[in-house]
């Protein structure tokens, strides 16, 4: 009573196929498969980029901007 037999699952499958149709189920399966593949590729790309050491960037003094700070007065 607690678990479903193979016959229960077959009946559910037939009802789902009658309600949605095989073409709609196939499209849903393709969309889901594409999403899973994209997720796996994204995870693999993230691991590859994380494994490479970060290239050190050289900062030059000419990129420094010299400005005078202004005081702000608080109005209440």
UniProtKB/Swiss-Prot annotation:
Keywords: Cell inner membrane, Cell membrane, Membrane, Protein transport, Translocation, Transmembrane, Transmembrane helix, Transport. Coiled coil: none annotated. Residues 41-50, 57-76 have a biased composition (Basic and acidic residues). GO terms for biological process: protein transport by the Tat complex. InterPro entries: TatA/B/E, TatA/E. It is a single-pass membrane protein. GO terms for molecular function: protein transmembrane transporter activity. One of its GO terms (cellular component) is TAT protein transport complex. Residues 41-76 are annotated as: Disordered. It is found in: Cell inner membrane. Its main location: membrane. It comes from the Bacteria. It holds the Pfam family TatA_B_E. The chain crosses the membrane at residues 1-21. Part of the twin-arginine translocation (Tat) system that transports large folded proteins containing a characteristic twin-arginine motif in their signal peptide across membranes. TatA could form the protein-conducting channel of the Tat system. Belongs to the TatA/E family. The Tat system comprises two distinct complexes: a TatABC complex, containing multiple copies of TatA, TatB and TatC subunits, and a separate TatA complex, containing only TatA subunits. Substrates initially bind to the TatABC complex, which probably triggers association of the separate TatA complex to form the active translocon. This is Sec-independent protein translocase protein TatA. It comes from Cupriavidus taiwanensis (strain DSM 17343 / BCRC 17206 / CCUG 44338 / CIP 107171 / LMG 19424 / R1) (Ralstonia taiwanensis (strain LMG 19424)).
């Amino acid at each position: 009573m607690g678990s479903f037999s193979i016959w229960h699952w077959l009946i559910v499958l037939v009802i789902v196929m009658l309600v949605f149709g095989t073409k709609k189920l196939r499209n849903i399966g393709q969309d889901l498969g594409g999403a899973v593949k994209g997720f796996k590729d994204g995870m693999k790309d993230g691991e590859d980029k994380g494994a490479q050491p970060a290239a050190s960037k050289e900062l030059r003094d000419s990129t420094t901007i010299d400005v005078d700070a202004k005081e702000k007065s608080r109005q209440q």
